[in-house]
Amino acid sequence: MTTTSLEAILKEKGNPVQLLRNSRIGMYVYPVVAPEFSNWRTEQWAWRNSAVLFDQSHHMDELIVEGPQAAEFLSHHGINSFANFDLNRAKHYVPVTPAGHVIGDHIIFREREDKFVLVGRAPTSNWLLFCAAYGKWNVRIKHDPRSPSRPEGERVLRTHYRFQIQGPEANKIFEKMNRGPIPDIKFFHVDWINIGSKKVQALRHGMSGAPGLEIWGPYEDKSYILNAILDAAKEAGVDLVRCGSRAYSTNTLESGWIPSPLPGIYTGDGMVAEYRKWLGADSYEASGTIGGSFVSDNIEDYYVNPFELGYDFYIGWKKDDFVGKDALVKMKGQTNRKKVTFEWNPEDVLKVIASAFEDGTPYKWIDFPQPNYASSSADRIEKDGKMVGMSMFNGYSFNERRVLSLGVVDADVQIGDVLTLKWGEAEPTQKTSTEQHKQAEIRVRVSDTPYSSEARENYADSWRTKK
């Protein structure tokens, strides 16, 4: 990629934790799409109560993988079973390192026997691009990287537009767009529907936990498709709310997907060491940030495995071999952490916010609706002063009237337990996304994933009885 590699930077800087905790790349940006079309509260409300339109055209990488060995290549480098991966289906694709550490994830679509489309964040794209060359596979890969974070007025073009319509009134819009009932598309299956004069592919999907379709097509059709969707919503009498990038980043909180685990590639020999030599100094992996109250000298303490994220049911154990299989077999017999939702105590959140209006050093600011200030977040979750978990992605839900975060806890932690989240960093770093601050302790109640208001109400007394 470039003459200076991630491996060279690590040799120069030493500990990868210090490299990433002091990166000055700044806040993660969802590019091009306006921050708000109305206001982020109304936009969050819409995916629960009416219908919302997400523009997903710019913030994700896209890979088109085709060729005689396309299926074999992707199966070998992902944990997923490909046994039932028929045409016009999609999967949540998860690659791991030979040591079993999660690298990232993509949504993968099978368009032909020998052609797949994958969309998602950079770590998985980078890994697959490397693996295609490293293993001398007979595949062709077209890489369309995400749009620039700060295009500075330059025109931005992509291979495909990508929209998602979700919410309880979404079907009314679909029927109006399609000029009649849409096909009965099963979850994570794909079919064709009409939008105006165009036939487009539609995936049954729902990122925020509400029913919906994800649609895509040639980028040059984007304006036409957008206007056709808005016209159909108007004809259907549905108040379709366009969602900006501020609210979009929080939609995963209610559905339970952790979007940005730290790629587990900073340690390891063999192909992972070669990968670090291949990755450039400008890559996501070299320039991204770690933020939060959890600090360890061992970068592997920030890694997660598929069992911890709830992805173990994806694993294709019957496959002859795939990268990481031996390591996952060993992990399967061990006790692993589990994914949960943390519900932040409102009084403690207000205490943190109030400190910004007081003299002296405030607590770390909680931005709304998205307080994350690093590419990968890692906040300590404690019980009686002992670390029992890690909060990895947080935000405010107007629908639930709560700050929530997603993360992992030790296996013996129970739903309903009230723990302590350490908010803010104990020592200053060079990150441009943090101000001078002090740490706060925030009580968090362990909740199910996906999170639901019914679960919160069942434990309503816990905030009053547990201090």
Feature map (PLM): residue ranges:
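Conserved, structured C-terminal
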Residues: 1-35, 112-467
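Short, charge-rich binding segments
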Residues: 84-86, 95-101, 106-112, 154-155
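Short, conserved acidic/polar surface loops in the N-terminal third of protein domains
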Residues: 74-76, 104-107, 119-120, 128-131
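Short amphipathic beta-strand starts and helix->beta connectors
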Residues: 43-49, 95-105, 194-203, 388-391
